[in-house]
């Protein structure tokens, strides 16, 4: 606030008056004198101010209408006790001032509703104003007038007179209504406290005002004083002026201040944030300029800048037309950006990715068929079908100029060499090898990349792997393709449809690159443990099954690969440690039971570690592992080799099962007990296997007389069928013939041969239907010491894929009906009986449902 000294009157503060707040005092240079303006009130008034004569003015009588000249105001509300300098330019306003000077009366200061109206109508002027006295008046050469007025009291306009030369109105003075003094005092204290906070936030209000406001004891004057300093809209100030009750006026002022303080706090936060950002930008600019200066001093100014280097890379790279246009456009956009902007970093990273992947850079594919065959044979023993397919592909490549890369899917249990086979194929063909693990991938963006709109976005695994390979015709090994999942982010297996389709992958489009990239020269090899793959994806691949290894193959793999690797890893020589054939066979048979060779490798490594320990501690020259001392190194054998059971038993049948890790022997047990004809099945069996047991039971019951079983026996006995290892879920129909054999053995009391295993699905008519996974099941039978295996007759054609050593070691008998199964599996064939149905005296109500099967 500025206290303006008035000659002969002293300062505003000394007279208990208030000057116009600095927040609303402003100059209007070049004003066209079309209306009143507020001028800056600083320093001492000029000597050419005309002082009003100190005549006795007529007294103001509350409630009595008196006539006063009216001075319409723009953009300001004058409160009582407020001293304001005004700039007057309108004719009517000047005449009103002259009228006041002649009669030495009060002038009514009323704010007009529309500040842009030069000649407002009487109904466009607020009805409540302030009666004021003219303290000083200054006439300017151009006819305008500067005047200093002092507010005295509020007044309500009753009506305007008909004078045309000036505004004149009859008005009633409005005295303040004090009301509840205690309430007013409480509000006054709150208003003063809030005003202090307001002044701290609003730099346009002088801090000296707080001291002046704190000394005001009159609550009405306090409200008017603070209201005059608030930077609020004219209607809000007018509402304060029109409030006669002091308590209500203080409450309105308090509400306006709280609203303004909230806005000022937000403004302060914004200013602080903007200032901090500007300081950061200026600091980065300063540091960058310093770095450039340092580089110049070091002699690096001759080096080309990043943009020039990017332009040269675009020219050198063999981009497609689409990619070149995209790169040129992005480079042009980068040139127009500030180097420090975040968008520039995004564009620079994009160009770096686009230019880093190989465009038309191929490695020379080897077409030497004998070399490829020798590489595959040296790295892997067996796997003839896979090797044959690879050599066929190379043979076609040697004759044809262009051939879309084959997409092979190697399916087999863990540990059979699927992943290492992919590396060998790359070595045999002379391609770069890239492995992409898909296990656990659930996001489609992992394959196709993220769009550049995301922060930290990058290409998908395909483009990343191409950048790693640095060639456009590598070998891609997509590992564990059956372990992908799908969730709300998309299905990655659907994204792979484009990658693995030779018709689509020449125009593979990554979300990040946004340009087509040719994947037709890439050779894709995928691996999986099962064929649990979406049909559309499976249709795009050539499936090659890799079954488990035979004992002979495992022994050969151990001699060629596992034992030499163990010697190298443990720092041993062939003279220091060796294992004879009998011991190696014992390790395979009695310490491992798997389709692959991973556990076998672990056992061989254990033997090597034991040998190193013996050589170091006992100072021996060499350690030889034999069948006699094998248990000294590896402990008690973990598995039994030979007959699955030690003797032929009633109701115990050996079935064959397929699992993800290869084939397994499946023991099925059955017992009969007195009861009411119920059948119970246990062993964590799933729905398909339960239905298979029901079908087997119905078949046996329908043929009971042929098997020498009296039909009433089914209603007097309960049968319980159990499959051990209850913690392992079991499902599938291939154990149907084994279930039927178990039930027949239990009901007839005929033992089952312990050296016979069987597999096949049974129908209600006793037919044996084909099954899958025959090779894995036969290998499991061979590992378990089985002599005779019964298989469905329709699976006999699959024996062509079975190794000769397996077929020679097993007696494989194809069967088509259940009678043949019982002939080979039971010690003796059941003898049929003659049975005549006895008449039933009354209806029999069964205790259980029609199926009679209870599963626990």
Curated annotation (Swiss-Prot):
Induction: By heat shock. ATP binds at residues 412-419. Residues 68-261 form the Lon N-terminal domain. GO terms for molecular function: ATP binding; ATP hydrolysis activity; ATP-dependent peptidase activity; sequence-specific DNA binding; serine-type endopeptidase activity. It is an enzyme of class 3 (hydrolase). SUPFAM superfamilies: P-loop containing nucleoside triphosphate hydrolases (SSF52540), PUA domain-like (SSF88697), Ribosomal protein S5 domain 2-like (SSF54211). Transmembrane segments: none annotated. The active site is at 734, 777. It catalyses: Hydrolysis of proteins in presence of ATP. InterPro entries: AAA+_ATPase, ATPase_AAA_core, Lon_bac, Lon_bac/euk-typ, Lon_lid, Lon_proteolytic, Lon_Prtase, Lon_prtase_N. Keywords: ATP-binding, Cytoplasm, Hydrolase, Nucleotide-binding, Protease, Serine protease, Stress response. Gene3D superfamilies: 1.10.8.60, 1.20.5.5270, 1.20.58.1480, 3.30.230.10, LON domain-like, P-loop containing nucleotide triphosphate hydrolases. Belongs to the peptidase S16 family. NCBIfam families: lon, PRK10787.1. Homohexamer. Organized in a ring with a central cavity. PANTHER family: ATP DEPENDENT LON PROTEASE FAMILY MEMBER (PTHR10046). This is Lon protease.
């Amino acid at each position: 606030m500025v206290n303006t000294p008035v000659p002969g009157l002293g300062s505003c503060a000394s007279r208990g008056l208030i000057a116009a707040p600095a927040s609303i005092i402003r100059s209007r240079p070049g004003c066209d004198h079309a209306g009143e303006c507020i001028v800056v009130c600083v320093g001492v008034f000029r000597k050419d101010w005309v002082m009003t004569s100190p005549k006795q003015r007529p007294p103001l009588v509350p409630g009595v209408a008196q006539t006063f000249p009216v001075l319409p105001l723009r953009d300001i509300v004058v409160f009582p006790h407020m001293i304001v300098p005004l700039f007057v330019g309108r004719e009517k306003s000047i005449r009103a001032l002259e009228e006041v000077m002649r009669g030495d009366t009060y002038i009514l200061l009323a704010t007009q509703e529309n500040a842009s109206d030069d000649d407002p109508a009487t109904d466009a002027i607020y009805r409540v104003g302030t009666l004021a006295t003219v303290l000083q008046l200054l006439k300017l050469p151009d006819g305008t007038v500067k005047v200093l007025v002092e507010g005295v009291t509020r007044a309500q306009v009753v009506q305007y007179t008909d004078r045309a030369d000036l505004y004149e109105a009859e008005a009633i003075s409005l005295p303040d209504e004090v009301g509840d003094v205690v309430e007013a005092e409480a509000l006054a204290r709150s208003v003063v406290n809030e005003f202090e906070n307001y002044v701290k936030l609003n730099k346009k209000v002088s801090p000296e005002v707080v001291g002046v406001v704190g000394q005001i004891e009159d609550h009405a004057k306090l409200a008017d004083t603070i209201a005059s300093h608030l930077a609020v809209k004219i209607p809000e100030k007018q509402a304060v002026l029109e409030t006669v009750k002091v308590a209500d006026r203080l409450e309105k002022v308090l509400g306006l201040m709280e609203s303004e303080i909230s806005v000022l706090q937000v403004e302060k936060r914004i200013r602080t944030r903007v200032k901090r950002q500007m300081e950061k930008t200026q600091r980065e600019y300063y540091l960058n300029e310093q770095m450039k200066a340092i580089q110049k001093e070091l002699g690096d100014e001759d080096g080309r800048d990043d943009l020039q280097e990017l332009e040269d890379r675009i020219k050198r790279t063999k981009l497609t037309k689409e990619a070149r246009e995209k790169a040129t456009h992005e480079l042009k956009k980068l040139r127009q950006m500030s180097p420090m902007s975040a968008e520039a970093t995004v564009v620079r990273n994009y160009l770096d990715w686009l230019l880093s992947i190989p465009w038309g850079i191929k490695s020379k594919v080897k077409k030497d068929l004998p070399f490829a065959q020798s590489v595959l044979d040296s790295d892997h023993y067996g796997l003839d079908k896979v090797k044959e397919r690879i050599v066929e592909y190379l043979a076609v490549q040697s004759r044809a100029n262009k051939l879309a890369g084959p997409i092979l899917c190697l399916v087999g249990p863990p540990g059979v060499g699927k992943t290492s086979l992919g590396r060998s194929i790359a070595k045999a063909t002379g391609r770069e090898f890239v492995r992409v693990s898909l296990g656990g991938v659930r996001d489609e963006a992992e394959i196709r990349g993220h769009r550049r709109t995301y922060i930290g976005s990058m290409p998908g695994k395909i483009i990343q792997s191409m950048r790693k390979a640095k060639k456009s015709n590598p070998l891609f090994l997509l590992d564990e393709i059956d372990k992908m999942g799908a969730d709300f982010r998309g299905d990655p297996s659907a994204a792979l449809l484009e990658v693995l389709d030779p018709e689509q992958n020449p125009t593979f489009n990554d979300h990040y690159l946004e340009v087509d990239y040719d994947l037709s020269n890439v050779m894709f090899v995928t691996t999986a443990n099962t064929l649990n793959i979406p049909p559309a994806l499976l249709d795009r691949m050539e499936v090659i099954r890799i079954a488990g290894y035979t004992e002979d193959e495992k022994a050969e793999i151990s001699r060629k690969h596992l034992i030499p690797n163990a010697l190298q890893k443990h720092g041993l020589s062939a003279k220091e440690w060796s294992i004879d054939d009998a011991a190696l066979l014992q390790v395979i048979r009695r310490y491992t039971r798997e389709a692959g060779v991973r556990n076998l490798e672990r056992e061989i490594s254990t033997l090597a570690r034991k040998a190193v320990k013996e050589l170091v501690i006992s100072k021996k020259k060499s350690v030889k592992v034999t069948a006699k001392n094998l248990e000294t190194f590896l402990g008690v054998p973990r598995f039994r080799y030979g007959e699955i059971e030690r003797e032929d038993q009633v109701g115990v049948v050996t079935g064959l099962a397929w699992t993800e890790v290869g084939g397994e022997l499946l023991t099925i047990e059955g017992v009969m007990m007195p009861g009411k004809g119920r059948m119970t099945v246990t062993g964590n069996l799933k729905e398909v296997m339960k239905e298979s047991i029901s079908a087997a039971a119905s078949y046996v019951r329908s043929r009971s007389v042929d098997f020498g079983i009296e039909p009433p026996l089914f209603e007097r006995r309960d049968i319980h069928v159990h499959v051990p290892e209850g913690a392992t879920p079991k499902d599938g129909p291939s154990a149907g013939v084994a279930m039927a054999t178990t039930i027949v053995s239990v009901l007839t009391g005929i033992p089952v041969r312990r050296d016979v295993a069987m597999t096949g699905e049974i129908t209600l008519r006793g037919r044996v239907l084909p099954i899958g996974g025959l090779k894995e099941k036969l290998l499991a039978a061979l590992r378990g010491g089985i002599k005779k295996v019964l298989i469905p007759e329709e699976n006999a054609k699959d024996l062509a894929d079975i190794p000769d050593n397996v077929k020679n070691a097993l007696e494989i008998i194809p069967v088509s009906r259940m009678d043949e199964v019982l002939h080979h599996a039971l010690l003796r064939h059941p003898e049929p009986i003659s049975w005549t149905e006895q008449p039933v005296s009354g209806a029999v109500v069964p205790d259980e449902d029609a199926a009679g099967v209870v599963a626990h």
